[in-house]
Amino acid sequence: MLAFTHEFPHDLPPAMSRGHCILSHGFESGPDATKVTALADVAQRLGWSHERPDYTDLDARHEISRVGDVPARLQRLVERAAEMATRGPLVLAGSSLGAYISAITSLQVPVAGLFLMVPPTTMGPMPALDAAAVPISVVHAWNDELIPAADVIAWAAERKARLLLVNDGHRLMRHVDASCQAFEALLRGL
């Protein structure tokens, strides 16, 4: 299943947008999830084209791992990002598992920036979280029940990434607006 929710700014054809954002949802979420939808609205308003790939078919593959087929998820993003990077500036953004694959993809595909929400610093047998040396903005929750804040703080510090820590849990449900503001700051800074 290769489904994408893809939009270009209404008043700009794709070739005239500021760039393109690929917004990757978290595990057992979807392309219409609250956070990636809110980020799409920010990108649209700022003149960036955007898309939200659907990884739900891969997340459902529990026979591969408890978080589905992560290598196939990563490959799907790498292939799409490589295609879009040939057209102009590319920003990858994601939540949780979507943040992980966005960061790892940046090591293989040229990107202008990364926006990572509650990124896991480890992913079982997959490589530890790493990212290209590009502008990185991270939003993480002090009370994340899955990913210790201390691990993300250390990871962000090593890369001198912009880091916003909020009083919330892994889903960042009380900080969607704060996440959008941080994403807007990243896009405006590029």
Predicted regions located by residue number:
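Serine-hydrolase catalytic machinery in alpha/beta-hydrolase-like enzymes
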Residues: L2-P89, I101-I104
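Conserved alpha/beta-hydrolase "acid-adjacent" motif
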Residues: D32, E145-D151
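Catalytic histidine neighborhood in serine/cysteine hydrolases
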Residues: S49-E51, A156-L172
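Short beta-strand immediately N-terminal to the catalytic nucleophile in serine-hydrolase-like folds
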Residues: L92-G94, M117
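Active-site loop->helix "elbow" adjoining a glycine-rich segment at hydrolase catalytic centers
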Residues: S95-A99
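A conserved short beta-strand
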Residues: P110-T122
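Short beta-strand/loop motif that positions the catalytic acidic residue
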Residues: A132, I136-H140, D144
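Post-His helix in hydrolase/transferase enzymes
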Residues: M173-R188
